[in-house]
Amino acid sequence: MTAKFLFSLFFILCCSVVYAQETSLFNGKDLTGWHIDVPALDKDTNLRNPFIIRNGMLVSLGEPQGHLITDKIYQNYRVEVQYRFAGAPGNCGLLLHASTPRSLYGMFPKSIESQMMHQNAGDFWCIVENIEVPEMEKRRGPKENWGITEGKERRVRNLTDNSEKPLGEWNTMIVECLNDQIKVWVNGDMVNHGFNCTAQKGQIALQAEGAEVEFRKVALTPITKISE
């Protein structure tokens, strides 16, 4: 009787606990679940798609420049991206809470960018959305220059140096978005934590911004709290 009771209790407890499941946003075969926005293709449809699949990896070729954007909108999540620069160091970014396309310089969707640029991973860039951090003037410059549109100071510097792996090695960027907060880790180092974000949901996007970047993991997990 006792064993039966304990088994029943165990079963009930197991059924009552819901574990957040990690979901891969990239199936390793094609770009299902994503769409591209590459302004140059409007004028010349013969240009190559800068986002391809190669050896089971998602690859941003860098040119022509543009974005690979999820079809779905996400809110309150952790996204893990494993990436490396395949050749020369360069620029790329992970865009969070993306919405209106081509809102900045006729290229960038309205969003908050978690920078992947070599030696600057984890900077925030405000793209017609805003976010705050402690010591704003130290990390963003004089307040009178702040802004979220062309010509304004949109960069919010990260908190660390040397968090990235040597060129050619794989980096892991983890970003947690919960309500108005965004927190970023690079290879286990907490590199940025913003609050009062003006957007709390949206699409996720990867950039083609001049350099070839390989991605072997892009995965999302729903969250209800920010990690310490």
Q: Residue spans of the language-model regions?
A:
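Carbohydrate-interacting regions of secretory-pathway proteins
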Residues: 21-228
